[in-house]
Amino acid sequence: MTVQTLAIVVLLVSFFVMIFLRFPIAYAVGLSSVLCLMVQGQALSDVCRLMVKGISSFSLMAVPFFITMGVLMGSGGISEKLIALADACVGWMRGGMAMVNIVASYFFGGISGSASADTASIGSIMIPMMVDQGYDADFSTAVTITSSCEGLLVPPSHNMVIYATTAGGISVGSLFLAGYLPGALLAIVLMIGSYIISVKENYPKGSPFTIKGFIKQLGTSIWALAAVVIVVFGVVGGVFTATESAAIAVIYSLLVSVFVYKGLDWKGVWHALDECVNTLSIVLILIATSAVFGNCLTMLHVPDLAANAITSVTSNPYIIALLIDLIILVLGCIMDMAPIILIATPILLPIATSIGIDPIQFGIIMVLNCGIGLLTPPVGSVLFIGSAVAKRPMEKVVKATLPFYLCMFIALLLLTYVPDISLAIPKLLGGYVSPIANPLGPVFIH
């Protein structure tokens, strides 16, 4: 066995053993990288250098600001405003409260960018409300946790910033624009699934739609929705960078939460900032250790080996794309979102681009794949949060979620094989030019 082969075995085996032993993911990534470097005879001082280099990125400065913005808005009483707006839009439909839940998650996702925050904030309000109106508790929880994944796609999303930094050379603004249609697609397929179940179970309709009611609720929610406009259109319009827009959005969110909606006092602001620091410390140590892990993968030529392994199975690009989806889905069952993006992107992105998948399109595919993983045992953090909020056994929630897994997989396949769902808005509004000469799937906008 060569040193290269031994190092690869040590790196991957030690990593997955520590994952299954429930080591904190950052420790598993870091320790397996150290063992790999030791096998290769590398100086351990390289670990510190690579960790510092991994977090020394101007783009990554946006991550703490986006996390802070989401926590401030989520703690500032905004959830009720967005639920009321969603109710004015779609509450009149059969299974109206399920539809409201899904649309409210789309709105809230554009502010928090976090599936966990969406589940906790929207779920704590919507699940009891749905149960009171005759909806099954497990169905209500399933709708809540699956719709929370919209927030991962709708900008601003700090996971998209992490992907853009890891992939290299990708515009954060274009990636933000790319998330709107996929997020809407996911919402639509979930609404179709909810409608079918609601008709079968004879769940009630809400109040009739009125223009007056919609305008009233839009007026009360406009302050919250404006935060998204500041971030996305500020970046796309070239007014400021993603980091600058995130910093401005934090100040705006603080002012709106404290002085406009008055959902936060200064003590609440302190608690929100404390939560941000805790979350950020986890994210940054993970990014730092993943930089060492990624360096090990590159030195050992693991991306090339993975590409050769996949192409040895089939040369059909459509099947290779499906295999990539399945690999990320399996990883999502045992790992959280950020480490998958940090570790899998350097391996899978070159394979994806070689078969005609645009880097921005692949970012959207990666994020949705990871989102499905957040709902899947045994790791499934959003699944655990939803079960805890609803006080329902996890196995019953999983059973109720099965039809929605199918809906999400349909959305995933559409995003994989129809590039323009992800790329249409960046091309039309952001002037994005795809580097892929022969895209996988039909292209309608050039």
Residues covered by each model-derived region:
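Alpha-helical transmembrane segments of multi-pass membrane transport proteins
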Residues: 1-446
